[in-house]
Curated annotation (Swiss-Prot):
Keywords: Disulfide bond, Secreted, Signal
Subunit and partners: Interacts with ASTL.
Signal peptide: 1-35
Name by which UniProt lists this protein: Sperm acrosome membrane-associated protein 3
Gene field: SPACA3
Taxonomic lineage of the native organism: Eukaryota, Metazoa, Chordata, Craniata, Vertebrata
Annotated localization: Secreted
Length: 163
């Protein structure tokens, strides 16, 4: 019987993709250790402390509803889109326009890394969300808000919260 020799038939992954995969994994591990899932009342209180009540005409209930339907109140939520962009943090802010991921050619309107949007203290997230809300669409920039929150009675989202 003839012995077979094993030799790689070429690269299984394009050059640099292993480094990209490792960096992504490392980023996930670092941010997941800081993950926080807020309760609706905890989130409402934090957003109130940041001055979000009434910002651009939106209530705390609007923001809490948005956070629930985008991330389930999870600060470390990251969703990968087919175009390679990511939705990041409790409000699922997209890297296509608002924050900097690995692609350096994006506008980065919020002037921050997308990983900054995963921080449980929410400071960077609130700053970026305020910039998004300054756009003509306001909270309607988020499909989840249009679909689940817009035009609805949202009082239950903050009902019983000590604000």
């Amino acid at each position: 019987m003839e012995a077979r020799s094993w030799a790689p038939r070429g690269h299984l992954c394009p050059p640099g993709s292993m480094l990209l995969a490792f960096a992504s994994l490392l980023g996930c591990l670092l941010t997941s250790s800081q993950a926080r899932v807020y309760s609706r009342c905890e989130l409402a209180k934090v957003l109130q402390d940041f001055g979000m009540e009434g910002y651009r005409g939106y209530t705390l209930a609007d923001w809490v509803c948005l956070a629930y339907f985008t991330s389930g109140f999870n600060t470390a939520a990251v969703d990968h889109e087919a175009d390679g962009s990511t939705n990041n943090g409790i409000f699922q802010i997209n890297s296509r326009k608002w924050c900097k991921n690995l692609n350096t050619e994006v506008p980065n309107v919020c002037q921050m890394y997308c990983s900054d949007l995963l921080n449980p203290n929410l400071k960077d997230t609130v700053i970026c969300a305020m910039k998004i809300t300054q756009q003509p669409q306001g909270l309607a920039s988020w499909e989840a808000w249009r679909r689940h929150c817009q035009g609805k009675d949202l009082t239950d989202w903050v009902d019983g919260c000590d604000l």
